[in-house]
Amino acid sequence: MGKIIGIDLGTTNSCVAIMDGGKARVLENSEGDRTTPSIIAYTQDGEILVGQPAKRQAVTNPQNTLFAIKRLIGRRFQDEEAQRDKDIMPYKIVAADNGDAWVEVKGQRVAPPQISAEVLKKMKKTAEDYLGEPVTEAVITVPAYFNDAQRQATKDAGRIAGLEVKRIINEPTAAALAYGLDKEVGNRTIAVYDLGGGTFDISIIEIDEVDGEKTFEVLATNGDTHLGGEDFDSRLINYLVEEFKKEQGFDLRNDPLAMQRLKEAAEKAKIELSSAQQTDVNLPYITADASGPKHMNIKVTRAKLESLVEDLVARSIEPLKVALKDAGLSVSDIQDVILVGGQTRMPMVQKKVADFFGKEPRKDVNPDEAVAVGAAVQGGVLAGDVKDVLLLDVTPLSLGIETMGSVMTPLITKNTTIPTKHSQVFSTAEDNQSAVTIHVLQGERKRANDNKSLGQFNLDGIQAAARGMAQIEVTFDIDADGILHVSAKDKNTGREQKITIKASSGLNEEEIQKMVRDAEVNAEADRKFEELVQTRNQADHLIHGTRKQLEEAGDKLPAEDKTAIEAALKDLEVAVKGEDKAEIEAKTQALVQVSGKLLEMAQAQQAQQGADAGADNAAQKDDDVVDAEFEEVKDKK
């Protein structure tokens, strides 16, 4: 059985880890980095770039460079969050036929799971390069507050990337695993505050140790799936745009290239202000108008940044109160606070969290890597490599159905430990009703329409009866991934209908299969491209070597041979500029054949040079011989 890898599929950065000799190891990607930017670029010549290479070309290709795609995964186009992003992202967010939020790239609509799959493929390849064997199974993390549609979409992304997703686990829970596994922590209650690039979670987790077995039980979770570092960046970008407009009278929002440069500079400035009190955002030639080029040079202090994002940090405090209340605990019951996610490096965030809990957060957990490490540990548990660890996670939101009067009736309440199963009997609202529609909802609001609709299905053929007499048993079954399966059964006739909730949004099986096939075709295209580059490089090497030998041969080479070689060289140089591998190989072979005489001359010249060098060395050695007397000295005993 191969390794089950752990992947933290982040909004801003992603990370992959494996269990190696009983320890979790974070792997370096092909660029030598332990985290990979979750950025995907579609270039003009059809290449797909992921990570740092995609980030590097973003300034010149802003419309086709996609970032923060996790904020769109499993979302409807009409969702408030998708509409907010539509107005600020440099790329185009559009509605899919099924109403989902998709992205338009080079005139084609692409689904967020398909885009995220490109990042997962890079993580998969990173692990394969390290292990030297194929990887087909993974544990992928999601924000604890992700709903059913978002979890399902993440699983779909895994499938498109060629991975069997063995388990979806919550990011704070994964961080707790990373923290608690190798420490003699005893019985403790911890709070994991996870503020990443695009999402925020708080989880209250109890770690119990009994006879050497550690149980990680999530007591409560809360959060905001649209609050993260990207929002902090946006605040700073907006401030810089307004300042520039005041100074120069020019709105940079109309210039996508300038906005891309500004995004990079704002992110860098934000990071610098975690350790410095002030920084300069200096962007020469950021744009130009009729009067000439314009430059940006704006000083930003830490205090200014804090004033811009104060309300965002405050927004993260309310879920802390709710999570503690749901867990039935007070601040004094929390023994350790763990910070996860790059945005928690901001001093203001650390201070607010410390003030709330009345204690300093721990500094021995790497906020960028802890989640991937925890995912790898869970992979080890599933593979049987890690013993004595039990993980009890919860469902973040209540699940129920719409009942008479458009009311949401919960069957499974939030923070219920999963996997779980619950049944409830309902009845008909009309006399002789022959069918019922089961409308499945997720959320905490009383009015059905105020909750997230996960889907609906019909149960037909109900036995005719007076209103309220028919007995319809509805069963909700949540698996370990937090994904919901629903069935409805007429208890009188035994007639039953079942569905695995595929949200009213989401990809259908046919779409997923097509994307899997597309990914396989891309993999084949990538392999062919690598072979073409290799063939080109060999041809270039031959061209360079042949030209050098031609120069050295001078007039010693017969004119007809020289003409034939020159012609073959020209043909190969033309072929190398093209995309036809077979053509390059054929022209390479043709050059090798006509260069026979030249090669013989070059080899003869090398042999002669070798012989001359040998003779010189021998003469040198003779000259260096020195007559000397010597005396044998016996060792003293």
Swiss-Prot record:
Pfam family, one: HSP70
Biased amino acid composition, Low complexity: 603-618
One GO MF term: ATP binding
Top-rank taxon: Bacteria
Induction data: By stress conditions e.g. heat shock.
Matches recorded under Gene3D superfamilies: 1.20.1270.10, 3.30.420.40, Actin, Chain A, domain 4, Substrate Binding Domain Of DNAk, Chain A, domain 1
Keyword Repressor in annotation: no
Region (Disordered): 603-637
Keyword entries, A-Z: ATP-binding, Chaperone, Nucleotide-binding, Phosphoprotein, Stress response
Modified residues (Phosphothreonine): 199
Keyword S-adenosyl-L-methionine found: no
Family: Belongs to the heat shock protein 70 family.
Cited function: Acts as a chaperone.
PANTHER family reported for this sequence: HEAT SHOCK PROTEIN 70KDA (PTHR19375)
Protein name per its UniProtKB record: Chaperone protein DnaK
Species per Swiss-Prot/TrEMBL record: Serratia proteamaculans (strain 568)
